[in-house]
Amino acid sequence: MILLISDLHLQEERPDITRAFLDLLDGRARHAKALYILGDFFEAWIGDDAMTPFQRSICQALRQLSDSGTTIYLMHGNRDFLIGQAFCQAAGCTLLDDPSVIELGGEAVLLMHGDTLCTRDVGYMKLRRYLRNPLSLWILRHLPLSTRQKLARKLRSESKSQTRMKNTEIVDVTPDEVPKVMAAHGVRTLVHGHTHRPAIHKLVIDGQPARRIVLGDWDRRGWALQVDEQGFQLAPFEFS
């Protein structure tokens, strides 16, 4: 069994989500061959050198799962792209490139966080290119801690206000971008998060059936994609 999740946005202000995640680690994830976390694992991450006690506790929980035999893969999201190798080594997980193609359920599957599919959100795409530039990343990681904290708060506030103002179609994936990206990687299944719109979309690419599986965000309930001998099963679960 393989589990895929995304968009937990873990933060101290949401202990219910944290508890649900820890329950997953102690339950289904213990029986999984691998756990894939496809971005926005944390609500914010300003650097491996600035881990809070809360974030350290999550790191320790991941390490316990890794030590139990479950392989953990972590992909950057738009809110936690400063997660680095120091955190991954401590947590016992492997940092996964976005995008990545893996073998899953007997087929090649494309994994993405999903933000790069939202090409109609021109403002965000421009900001993303700037922030992910190697020079920008180096500067961000070397800013004083207080400056990084202020910048993170500012970016989060602006992101929330702009998302509320934007047309819902703009912040969703661009329909034409999906088949183009899937064809470029030679896959018939795409799994991503980011949009907070969980669903399994049936597609046709080059005359062949295909599908786009969108993982859900953890807010009022959790979401996980389970891949086993029964196939691909996307389902929510209630917080206990």
From Swiss-Prot:
<comment type="similarity">
    <text>Belongs to the LpxH family.</text>
</comment>
<feature type="binding site">
    <location>
        <position position="40"/>
    </location>
    <ligand>
        <name>Mn(2+) 2</name>
    </ligand>
</feature>
<comment type="function">
    <text>Hydrolyzes the pyrophosphate bond of UDP-2,3-diacylglucosamine to yield 2,3-diacylglucosamine 1-phosphate (lipid X) and UMP by catalyzing the attack of water at the alpha-P atom. Involved in the biosynthesis of lipid A, a phosphorylated glycolipid that anchors the lipopolysaccharide to the outer membrane of the cell.</text>
</comment>
<keyword id="KW-0378">Hydrolase</keyword>
<keyword id="KW-0464">Manganese</keyword>
<feature type="binding site">
    <location>
        <position position="166"/>
    </location>
    <ligand>
        <name>substrate</name>
    </ligand>
</feature>
<keyword id="KW-0479">Metal-binding</keyword>
<feature type="binding site">
    <location>
        <position position="194"/>
    </location>
    <ligand>
        <name>Mn(2+) 2</name>
    </ligand>
</feature>
<dbReference type="GO" id="GO:0009245">
    <property type="term" value="P:lipid A biosynthetic process"/>
</dbReference>
<dbReference type="InterPro" id="IPR004843">
    <property type="entry name" value="Calcineurin-like_PHP_ApaH"/>
</dbReference>
<dbReference type="InterPro" id="IPR010138">
    <property type="entry name" value="UDP-diacylglucosamine_Hdrlase"/>
</dbReference>
<keyword id="KW-0997">Cell inner membrane</keyword>
<feature type="binding site">
    <location>
        <position position="7"/>
    </location>
    <ligand>
        <name>Mn(2+) 1</name>
    </ligand>
</feature>
<feature type="binding site">
    <location>
        <position position="9"/>
    </location>
    <ligand>
        <name>Mn(2+) 1</name>
    </ligand>
</feature>
<feature type="binding site">
    <location>
        <position position="196"/>
    </location>
    <ligand>
        <name>Mn(2+) 1</name>
    </ligand>
</feature>
<dbReference type="GO" id="GO:0005737">
    <property type="term" value="C:cytoplasm"/>
</dbReference>
<dbReference type="GO" id="GO:0030145">
    <property type="term" value="F:manganese ion binding"/>
</dbReference>
<dbReference type="InterPro" id="IPR029052">
    <property type="entry name" value="Metallo-depent_PP-like"/>
</dbReference>
<keyword id="KW-0444">Lipid biosynthesis</keyword>
<keyword id="KW-0441">Lipid A biosynthesis</keyword>
<dbReference type="Pfam" id="PF00149">
    <property type="entry name" value="Metallophos"/>
</dbReference>
<protein>
    <recommendedName>
        <fullName>UDP-2,3-diacylglucosamine hydrolase</fullName>
        <ecNumber>3.6.1.54</ecNumber>
    </recommendedName>
</protein>
<feature type="binding site">
    <location>
        <position position="113"/>
    </location>
    <ligand>
        <name>Mn(2+) 2</name>
    </ligand>
</feature>
<comment type="pathway">
    <text>Glycolipid biosynthesis; lipid IV(A) biosynthesis; lipid IV(A) from (3R)-3-hydroxytetradecanoyl-[acyl-carrier-protein] and UDP-N-acetyl-alpha-D-glucosamine: step 4/6.</text>
</comment>
<dbReference type="GO" id="GO:0008758">
    <property type="term" value="F:UDP-2,3-diacylglucosamine hydrolase activity"/>
</dbReference>
<keyword id="KW-0443">Lipid metabolism</keyword>
<feature type="binding site">
    <location>
        <position position="194"/>
    </location>
    <ligand>
        <name>substrate</name>
    </ligand>
</feature>
<feature type="binding site">
    <location>
        <position position="163"/>
    </location>
    <ligand>
        <name>substrate</name>
    </ligand>
</feature>
<dbReference type="InterPro" id="IPR043461">
    <property type="entry name" value="LpxH-like"/>
</dbReference>
<feature type="binding site">
    <location>
        <position position="159"/>
    </location>
    <ligand>
        <name>substrate</name>
    </ligand>
</feature>
<keyword id="KW-1003">Cell membrane</keyword>
<feature type="binding site">
    <location>
        <position position="121"/>
    </location>
    <ligand>
        <name>substrate</name>
    </ligand>
</feature>
<dbReference type="GO" id="GO:0019897">
    <property type="term" value="C:extrinsic component of plasma membrane"/>
</dbReference>
<feature type="binding site">
    <location>
        <position position="78"/>
    </location>
    <ligand>
        <name>Mn(2+) 2</name>
    </ligand>
</feature>
<feature type="binding site">
    <location>
        <position position="40"/>
    </location>
    <ligand>
        <name>Mn(2+) 1</name>
    </ligand>
</feature>
<keyword id="KW-0472">Membrane</keyword>
<feature type="binding site">
    <location>
        <begin position="78"/>
        <end position="79"/>
    </location>
    <ligand>
        <name>substrate</name>
    </ligand>
</feature>
